[in-house]
């Protein structure tokens, strides 16, 4: 008896643990095996009794009882009848919960096609039968017959016949001589009769023998789907339904509202339509109705089932009573509101609350202020338990009463409960992992949450009404994780770049800056050999100094001598004397004592950068605990001194430069001059525009620097002592608030503005905000401001979507092992842009592992292979003058299903080597996505003031000797050296003979140095006109025009505003008559023959469309003179608006609009015959392989001449290179370098720092697939794309069997495509295109092994990262232990337990 009672309670089956999920097409038998009964009536529930109708959609006999352990008619009630089936109403007595998982079915009177397999592209049924979707639809929707068995008639198998043709054929050949059918029965019959083995063999044969290029692709597609059916055990005819499953009624509820109305799920409507039409069809068949009526009913049934599965995919959307489209089964899964994203990936959480945040400056870094009311509500169960344990209450009810009355003992207990129990604070939008952090709650009065000021940067929070949510970690494990991993004190460094993120900002910075200012002539300052008081301003003791400050004998800013006591390198006490100020001494008093933290750290002007560096030093040397205490202390110091200083500013603090109007007048004169040049026809409209904009930009910059000089200089009073520093300058210079750009607008001139289209308006705003704008200026400035606000709204969404795609593609990149042992690596060097070092080598290699020994020139090993490059190595590396380092990278990591710790390097958020199980992919995605949102939200800060970012010269950043590589220079008529070669480079060689910098020269640049010159830092190397691309002559001679026919290929345009003529090449391809002209300028010698260039081809320059010709026929020219010029587009404002789409474009690996054409081999260029309106260019490779042909649209400017030699990877036509071409031509390393640099460029422009390794992680995920070039001895087909790891596994097996391995080339996929092609179909389906992903997965019978993070979140298990990764290891150890115990039991030998094998 006892056992039975126990069984009663244990009957609820435990959820099965599983480690993979398979999806396939269900057969009619399978559907019937799930079903508990057939639904025959469309009725739902009786509107009077509210009881379900029998055999209806809510039938209790089929789906189970409505109340627990009670049958419908009430004959059997209570638990003792469990399992009894009532003979009166047929209901089983059990839990009502079974109505959530018992299914029903509808037997269809006629088969119908499953719309997903029919209409989800590519149509699976269509591919399988090799029929067009249009034809299939005509058969299915009863418009055409299809011949199934032609017999002896001349009809073909699968030929479509219209109604008339069918009748005619029957008359002609007799009714029984052939079989033709219509509707889904026909398709089902064809699918049933398919012989998959034979078709597959035929297709393989055809692929092997076909010669055309396009055919194999089509055949491959079909072969793939046929193989999928063979492998997965699905039968083709299952794509046609004969039975429709009905989902459990509690998943499509029907709830009575008051007033006799019902709220119902749309599915019930859709099911009712199916049942109604099905029943009507059954009746019509029984009544032997005319064929046409039955056919119509079958078509309607097909449409009803289509609407049930995927409403709106075919034909009109079916709407409900309120004209709203009904939500079908497919819609339940799809999109943001679908099952995947709404319920499985994002759930609402209990034990949470939200409130407004206010600042809590007296909190410690690990604390937050929690309102008592909130805490009482959130910790209720803990309080009840503690009240019970202490004997204050015997039952939960009593405890509840106590808490509701807020008795004093409740507050005491709340204090106990909350002690050491961290809570998590989250601020939406959570853009990176620092958007959720754990704090220890501190109970406060009031209703607002208090937040520590230093964590605001991580949350991106401010106190203008932001709200935050509080979550309580309940279990011990959760509390442990919150404390160890998420505590705010454990998140001092930014995961994106490793810099401290707990940095003081705003008031604190201002206070510290004020504290560290030095003022000359302040009272009590130390004067050397001061006869009156030689000891004035000399202090050795902190108390003495405080006393002097309090008695006003000395100010915070006076210069004093101070004896500092600290620790020497071995930890011994030392003392030194410093020239400093009392303010800096106060600041030094909070520094931790450590040999590596000397007084020099604070003995300087404390700007935000310096403070950040100081925190960094303290963190690296003194550890986390010291840094946290230190941060809290400097915060207090900063606040108190900002408060004491009382810094404020007034109108007069904005100093307008005195010479403002003289500079403006100068510029106006210059602009007038350009106007005149334009009137005289010396420059074009576009060039004038560019020059005017340039002039105003320069004027604006000059004014800004004048103003900065005025504001930053400290005035002296009559005694020669410093007056107060300008407040605005203090705020801006310290980094507390405001930027030079904003100060410029306040006090210099507002500057150039952009139109909404992004072009710059020629007339700038000359006034500043202090003087005030006039009406016209104000109007011009509204554009930029409005555009900024509109952009903000749009780009937040874009940036969020980019982050979502990044997370999706990288979610399964997890650290799986310590070292994969690969020998490969990538080479890193400093990035130099226009002669400026943009990213130093040190910043790029810090915290990465070396791929080979890093050896100094004298042979000493600085860093051995496989070791991490730390801060202490950097000095040695720069001393050794090393320019290039080979480091390990995730791009070359050989770990399967993840990456290894050595290839990844340092965990930036902790400053230590990365741990196993760290989800580096998600961190990378957040690090790249988070600033995207930040930046887009901040576009309007510059107020649209145009910033011209176009350099037109190179300056040397080093001293040294000039060497010129690939010398192609000539002296032109003006006596300037001009670069006439395409790859001329100026190399700066240091005194030790190492190359310090290499500058590639723009074609047509005027070179200011020559071979062997000594060059100083900052000296000009070359300059060029940024607005035009010149076409030069390479030899001296006489100009001759070729094919430049007036009105056909050249036109003299007279500028309407100037009356000046200029010759422009026009598009000559318009008419057939002129299509084969080749407009060019040739250089003749004295005899009138075309001269030869040194490499043997003719001296002839082909002209592109819109080239402006600058020489007359017959004119004498010297090498390096300009023959014609092509105007480049006007300078656009570079703003991250261009940036975010650019980042997305690079990650999506889209081909740019005007993609560059890259040379695939090194070789010689020759021009072939023109083809229609394209130029034919042939590259003959040096290695003797087949020549490569390129067809280039005629208007494009090709800067190569006949006979030019190009290197592999050189640009034949300029433009943005397509990433796929870089991968194919130069390989993975070059591609990665290109993507990393291009993406970094966008972020750098905005001053955002992201570590390269994050971008590398994403690029690795984009390169997961391989295209098969040679299938070796395997079953794989050439041209197929498979996973890299799959290829490795297949090859290992083939090599083991001594067969020929498969060859493949890496393929670059955009992030969206890569996410949709992950091995896990659950992850792909929850991302985008759910229908397509699931259809494909079902056809292939895919198995999801649940390896990534997303799949595991969806099925509700622990994610295989972080602590979850360890759980998996522990489980596998436990399993092995179980096996051993079982084996031992079986043996029953009584031997000792064998040694446990180590975890893999």
From Swiss-Prot:
- What keywords sit in the KW lines? DNA-directed RNA polymerase, Magnesium, Metal-binding, Nucleotidyltransferase, Transcription, Transferase, Zinc
Q: Which Gene3D superfamilies match?
A: 1.10.132.30, 1.10.150.390, 1.10.1790.20, 1.10.40.90, 2.40.40.20, 2.40.50.100, RNA polymerase II, clamp domain (4.10.860.120), RNA polymerase Rpb1, domain 3 (1.10.274.100)
What the record notes about the co-factor is: Binds 1 Mg(2+) ion per subunit. Binds 2 Zn(2+) ions per subunit.
GO molecular function term, any single one: magnesium ion binding
Q: Name one GO biological process term.
A: DNA-templated transcription
Source organism's superkingdom?
Bacteria
**Cofactor dependence:** Mg(2+); Zn(2+)
Q: What does this protein do?
A: DNA-dependent RNA polymerase catalyzes the transcription of DNA into RNA using the four ribonucleoside triphosphates as substrates.
The record's similarity note reads:
Belongs to the RNA polymerase beta' chain family.
Q: Which NCBIfam families match?
A: rpoC_TIGR
* Name of the protein: DNA-directed RNA polymerase subunit beta'
């Amino acid at each position: 008896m006892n056992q039975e009672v126990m069984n009663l309670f244990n009957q609820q089956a435990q959820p099965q643990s599983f480690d993979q999920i398979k999806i396939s097409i269900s057969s009619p038998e399978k559907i019937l095996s799930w079903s508990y009964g057939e639904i025959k009536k469309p009725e739902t529930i009786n509107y009077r009794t509210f009881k379900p109708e029998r055999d209806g959609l809510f039938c209790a006999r089929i789906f189970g009882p409505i109340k627990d352990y009670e049958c419908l008619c009430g004959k059997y009630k209570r638990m003792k009848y469990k399992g009894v089936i009532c003979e009166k109403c047929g209901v089983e007595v059990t839990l009502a919960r079974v109505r959530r998982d018992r299914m029903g079915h509808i037997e269809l009177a006629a088969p119908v096609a499953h719309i997903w397999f029919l209409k989800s592209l590519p149509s699976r049924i269509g591919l399988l039968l090799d029929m067009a979707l249009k034809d299939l639809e005509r058969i299915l929707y009863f418009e055409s017959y299809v011949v199934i068995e032609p017999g002896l008639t001349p009809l073909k198998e699968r030929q479509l016949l219209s109604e008339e043709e069918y009748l005619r054929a029957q008359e002609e050949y007799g009714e029984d001589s052939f079989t033709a059918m219509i509707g889904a029965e026909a398709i089902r019959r064809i699918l049933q009769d398919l012989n998959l083995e034979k078709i597959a063999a035929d297709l393989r044969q055809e692929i092997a023998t076909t010669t055309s290029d396009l055919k194999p692709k089509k055949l491959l597609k079909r072969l793939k789907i046929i193989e999928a059916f063979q492998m997965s055990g699905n039968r083709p005819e299952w794509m046609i339904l004969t039975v429709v499953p009905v989902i459990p009624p509690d998943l499509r509820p029907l709830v009575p509202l008051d007033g006799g109305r019902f709220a119902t799920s749309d599915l019930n409507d859709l099911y009712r339509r199916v049942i109604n039409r099905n029943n009507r069809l059954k009746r019509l068949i029984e009544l032997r109705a005319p064929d046409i009526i039955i056919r119509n009913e079958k078509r309607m049934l097909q449409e009803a089932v289509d609407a049930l599965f995927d409403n709106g995919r075919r034909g009109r959307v079916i709407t409900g009573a309120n004209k709203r489209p009904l939500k079908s089964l497919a819609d339940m899964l799809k999109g943001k509101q679908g099952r995947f994203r709404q319920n499985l990936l994002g759930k609402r959480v209990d034990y949470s609350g939200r409130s407004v945040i206010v600042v809590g400056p007296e909190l410690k870094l690990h604390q937050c202020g929690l309102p008592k009311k909130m805490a009482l509500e959130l910790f209720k169960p803990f309080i009840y338990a503690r009240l019970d344990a202490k004997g204050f209450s015997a039952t939960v009810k009593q405890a509840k009463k106590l808490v509701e009355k807020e008795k004093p003992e409740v507050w005491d207990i709340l204090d106990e409960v909350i002690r050491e129990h961290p809570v998590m604070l989250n601020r939406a939008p959570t853009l990176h992992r620092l958007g959720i952090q754990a704090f220890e709650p501190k109970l406060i009065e009031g209703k607002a949450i208090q937040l520590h000021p230093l964590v605001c940067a991580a949350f991106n929070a401010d106190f203008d009404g932001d709200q935050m949510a509080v979550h309580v970690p309940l279990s011990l494990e959760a509390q442990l994780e919150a404390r160890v991993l998420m505590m705010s004190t454990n998140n001092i460094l930014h995961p994106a770049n490793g810099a401290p993120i707990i940095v003081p900002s705003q008031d604190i910075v201002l206070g510290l800056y004020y504290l560290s200012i030095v003022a000359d002539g302040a009272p009590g300052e130390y004067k050397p050999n001061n006869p009156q008081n030689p000891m004035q301003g000399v202090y050795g003791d902190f108390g003495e100094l405080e006393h002097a400050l309090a008695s006003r004998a000395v100010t915070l800013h006076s210069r004093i001598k101070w004896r500092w006591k600290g620790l020497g390198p071995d930890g011994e006490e030392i003392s030194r004397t410093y020239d400093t100020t009392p303010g800096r001494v106060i600041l030094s008093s909070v520094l931790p004592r450590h040999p590596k933290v000397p007084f020099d750290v604070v003995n300087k002007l404390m700007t935000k950068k310096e403070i950040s560096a100081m925190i960094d030093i303290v963190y690296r040397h003194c550890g986390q605990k010291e840094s946290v205490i230190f941060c809290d202390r400097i915060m207090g110091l900063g606040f108190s001194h900002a408060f004491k200083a009382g810094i404020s500013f007034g109108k007069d603090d904005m100093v307008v430069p005195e010479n403002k109007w003289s500079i403006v007048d100068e510029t106006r004169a210059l602009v007038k001059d350009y106007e005149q040049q334009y009137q005289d026809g010396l420059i074009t409209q576009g060039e004038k525009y560019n020059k005017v904009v340039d002039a105003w930009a320069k004027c604006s910059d000059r004014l800004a620097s004048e103003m900065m000089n005025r504001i930053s200089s400290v005035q002296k009073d009559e005694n020669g002592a410093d007056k107060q520093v300008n407040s605005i300058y203090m705020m801006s210079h310290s980094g507390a608030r405001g930027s030079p750009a904003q100060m410029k607008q306040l006090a210099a001139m507002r500057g150039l503005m952009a139109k909404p289209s992004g072009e710059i308006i020629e007339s700038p705003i000359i006034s500043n905000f202090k003087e005030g704008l006039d009406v016209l200026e104000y109007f011009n400035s509204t554009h930029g401001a409005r555009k900024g606000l509109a952009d903000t709204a749009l780009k937040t969404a874009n940036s969020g979507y980019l982050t979502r795609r990044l997370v999706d593609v990288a979610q399964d990149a997890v650290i799986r092992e310590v070292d994969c042992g690969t020998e490969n690596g990538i080479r890193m060097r400093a990035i130099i842009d226009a002669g400026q070092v943009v990213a130093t080598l040190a910043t790029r290699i810090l915290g990465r592992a070396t791929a080979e020994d890093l050896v100094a020139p004298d042979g000493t090993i600085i860093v051995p292979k496989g070791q991490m490059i730390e801060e202490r190595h950097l000095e040695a590396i720069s001393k050794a003058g090393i320019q290039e380092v080979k480091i390990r990278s995730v791009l070359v990591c050989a770990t399967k299903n993840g990456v290894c710790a050595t290839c990844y390097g340092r965990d930036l958020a902790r400053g230590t080597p990365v741990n196993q199980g760290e989800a580096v992919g998600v961190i990378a995605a957040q690090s790249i996505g988070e600033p995207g949102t930040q930046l887009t939200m901040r576009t309007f800060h510059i107020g649209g003031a145009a910033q011209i970012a176009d350099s037109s010269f190179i300056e040397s950043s080093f001293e040294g000797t000039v060497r010129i590589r690939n010398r192609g220079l000539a002296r032109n008529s003006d006596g300037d050296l001009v670069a006439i070669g395409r790859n001329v480079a100026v190399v700066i060689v240091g005194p030790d003979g190492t190359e310090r910098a290499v500058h590639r020269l723009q074609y047509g640049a005027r070179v200011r140095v020559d071979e062997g010159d000594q060059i100083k830092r900052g000296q000009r190397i070359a300059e060029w006109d940024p607005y035009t691309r010149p076409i030069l002559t390479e030899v001296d001679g006489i100009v001759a025009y070729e094919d430049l026919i007036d009105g056909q290929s050249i036109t003299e345009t007279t500028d309407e505003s100037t009356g000046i003529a200029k010759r422009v090449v026009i598009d000559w391809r318009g008419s057939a008559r002129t299509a084969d002209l080749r407009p060019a300028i040739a250089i003749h010698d004295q005899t009138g023959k075309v001269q030869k260039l040194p490499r043997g081809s003719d001296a002839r320059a082909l002209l592109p469309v819109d080239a402006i010709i600058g020489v007359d026929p017959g004119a004498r020219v010297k090498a390096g003179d300009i023959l014609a010029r092509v105007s480049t587009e006007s300078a656009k404002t570079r703003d991250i608006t261009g940036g975010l789409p650019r980042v997305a474009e690079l990650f999506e690996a889209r081909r740019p609009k005007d993609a560059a054409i890259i040379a695939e081999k090194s070789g010689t260029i020759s021009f072939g015959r023109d083809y229609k309106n394209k130029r034919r260019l042939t590259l003959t490779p040096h290695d003797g392989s087949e020549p490569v042909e390129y067809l280039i649209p005629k208007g494009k400017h090709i800067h190569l001449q006949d006979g030019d030699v190009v290197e592999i990877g050189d640009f034949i036509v300029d433009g943005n290179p397509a990433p796929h071409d870089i991968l194919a031509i130069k390989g993975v390393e070059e591609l990665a370098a290109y993507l990393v640099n291009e993406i970094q460029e966008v972020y750098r422009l905005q001053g955002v720092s992201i570590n390269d390794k994050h971008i590398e992680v994403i690029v690795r995920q984009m390169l997961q697939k391989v295209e098969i070039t040679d299938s070796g001895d395997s079953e794989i087909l050439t041209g197929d794309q498979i996973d890299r790891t799959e290829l490795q596994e297949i090859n290992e097996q083939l090599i083991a069997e001594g067969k020929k391995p498969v060859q493949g080339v890496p393929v670059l996929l955009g992030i969206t495509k890569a996410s949709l092609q992950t091995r896990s179909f659950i992850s792909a389906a929850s991302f985008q295109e759910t229908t397509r992903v699931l259809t494909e997965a079902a056809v292939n019978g895919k198995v999801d092994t649940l390896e990534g993070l997303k799949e595991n979140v969806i099925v509700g298990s622990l994610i295989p990262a972080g602590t979850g990764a360890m759980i998996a290891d522990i489980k596998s150890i436990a399993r092995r232990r179980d096996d051993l115990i079982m084996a031992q039991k079986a043996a029953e030998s009584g031997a000792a337990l064998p040694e446990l094998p180590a975890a893999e």
